[in-house]
């Protein structure tokens, strides 16, 4: 059972790197030719920055990373479908028949499916946020960000980067609060 869970988490992370990082990075560059798609991709990057914060929190073994990872999996699909405080797409679906818009619409469904698949994988680690004690899921979710950190930063101290991520949380919180207030104002007016 342990190896199946570990395999699923590794698979989830590998697919997430492709779907949530590599593809959107390339697609943003290509999408600059279509202002509507480019604005929607910028919304995605603002929201998905919580994933970067999560990786650095978990690489420093800061348990709040489980919560930020869970929240990112909720916020990202919401953002690709509804926008954020800075850009709110029209209520109508993404119009037009261009290839870029078709690719964006398809990618949006893939992102939604991936996040729906990922949420049950991280939920068993949520008790670790409040000191539920170490368990298999906590250890597995710490291991992959630590591997990433070592690959990218070598011998650097992950604790320093973890605390930088902690410092980024209030900034992200302000952005999120601004988005929530703006969304509320749009829906009640």
Residue map of PLM features:
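Hydrophobic transmembrane alpha-helical segments in integral membrane proteins
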Residues: 1-22, 159-166
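Membrane-interfacial loop-to-transmembrane alpha-helix junctions, especially the N-terminal start
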Residues: 36-45
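Hydrophobic, membrane-inserted alpha-helices
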Residues: 22-27, 48-57
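N-terminal signal-anchor/start-transfer transmembrane helix
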Residues: 17-34, 176-177
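C-terminal membrane-adjacent module
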Residues: 106-189
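Membrane-interface helix caps and helix-loop-helix hairpins in membrane proteins
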Residues: 35, 57-66
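Short juxtamembrane and helix-loop transition motifs at transmembrane-helix boundaries
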Residues: 1-8, 27-37, 93
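Membrane-proximal helix-loop-helix units in multi-pass membrane proteins
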Residues: 66-140
């Amino acid at each position: 059972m342990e190896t199946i869970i570990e395999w699923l988490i590794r698979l989830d992370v590998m697919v997430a790197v492709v779907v949530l990082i590599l593809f959107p990075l390339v697609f943003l560059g290509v999408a600059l030719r279509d202002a509507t798609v480019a604005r929607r991709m910028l919304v995605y990057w603002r929201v998905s920055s919580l994933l970067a914060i999560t990786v650095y929190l978990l690489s420093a073994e800061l348990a709040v990373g489980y919560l930020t990872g869970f929240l990112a999996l909720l916020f990202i699909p919401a953002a690709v479908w509804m926008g954020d405080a800075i850009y709110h797409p029209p209520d109508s679906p993404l119009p037009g028949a261009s290839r870029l818009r078709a690719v964006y619409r398809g990618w949006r469904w893939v992102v939604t499916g991936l996040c729906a698949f990922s949420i049950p994988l991280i939920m068993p680690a949520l008790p670790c946020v409040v000191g539920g004690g170490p368990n298999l899921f906590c250890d597995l979710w710490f291991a992959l960000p630590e591997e990433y950190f070592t690959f990218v930063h070598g011998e650097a101290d992950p604790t320093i980067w973890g605390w930088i991520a902690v410092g980024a949380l209030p900034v992200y919180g302000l952005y999120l609060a601004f988005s929530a207030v703006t969304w509320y104002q749009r829906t009640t007016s």
